[in-house]
Amino acid sequence: MSLQNDIITALGVKSSIEPAQEIRVSVDFLKNYLNAHPFVTSLVLGISGGQDSTLTGKLCQTAITELRNETGNARYQFIAVRLPYGVQADEADCQDAIAFIQPDRVLTVNIKPAIEASEATLRAIGVELSDFVKGNEKARERMKAQYSIAGMNAGLVVGTDHAAEAVTGFFTKYGDGGTDINPIFRLNKRQGKALLRELGCPSHLYTKAPTADLEEDRPSLPDEVALGVTYEKIDDYLEGKQIEAKDAAIIENWYRKTEHKRRPPITVFDDFWR
C-alpha cells in the first residue's frame, strides 16, 4: 500500500460525499456522545469567522437544538466563543458567522492582555519570544479560555480539525489541536465547503483565503503560502487522485514531520518515530 493510501485510510477520507448525509453523520455523532455522557450538557467552540469554525459551529448548534427538543433538557447549550487578539481584521466575517450559526450563547474573550502578560513575564527571565512562538501562544491561550468556560458549564471543547489540516499538521500542538471532540475530522477542505453550501451559509465565509493569522510579522498569511501547496492539491491527494510529484512530496513531508502532533505524548512503547 502506498503512503497516500495509508494516509487516506488513517484520516478516513472519502473520495466523494453526499453533503446532507455527512451533516447528519456529524450531528448524530455529537448527539450520541452527549447522550452517552449525561453529565456533559454544553459544547464550547471558538468562532473565528472562517470556514472550519463556521461549519463546526452550525453542526454543534444543530445537535444541541435537537437534543433539547428530544430530551426536554433545557440545560443543553452551545456556547460560541469569540477570541480576538485586540481587534480582529475580519471582525465583520465573525459577526456574519455568528448570525448564520445563531448560537445559544456568545462570549467574547480578548486574549491580548493575557498574551502580553505572559510575554512580559518570560522577558523578565531572559526569554524573548519570537513572532512564530508568540503566535502559538495565542492559539494556546484561546484553548485555555475555552477549557475554562467548558469547565464552568459542564462542557466539551469542540475542535475544527479536518483531514486537510490533519495531513499537514497545520495546527498548534495543545492549541487548536487540543480539543475534546472533532466532528469534521474526516472531511477535506472542499467537502467542508459542500456542507456549508448545503446548510445555506453565506458564501464569503467559505470562499475567502484561509488563514491562521497568528503571526504579527506576516499578518493574514494564507495557509497555502505557509504550507507551500494549495488546498486544491491537498484535497485531490486525500481523495486518491494523482497529483504532481512535487506537490505530493510536500504533503507527505508535512505528514511525516508532524506525526507527533496527531498522537498522544510519546512513550517508550511508541516506535513510529524510529
UniProtKB/Swiss-Prot annotation:
One of its GO terms (cellular component) is cytoplasm. Pfam families: NAD_synthase. It comes from the Bacteria. Pathway: Cofactor biosynthesis; NAD(+) biosynthesis; NAD(+) from deamido-NAD(+) (ammonia route): step 1/1. Deamido-NAD(+) binds at residues 140, 173, 180, 260-261. ATP binds at residues 46-53, 160, 189, 211. Its EC number is 6.3.1.5. It is an enzyme of class 6 (ligase). SUPFAM superfamilies: Adenine nucleotide alpha hydrolases-like (SSF52402). Mg(2+) binds at residues 52, 165. GO terms for molecular function: ATP binding; glutaminase activity; metal ion binding; NAD+ synthase (glutamine-hydrolyzing) activity; NAD+ synthase activity. Catalyzes the ATP-dependent amidation of deamido-NAD to form NAD. Uses ammonia as a nitrogen source. HAMAP family: NadE_ammonia_dep. Homodimer. This is NH(3)-dependent NAD(+) synthetase. It comes from Pectobacterium carotovorum subsp. carotovorum (strain PC1).
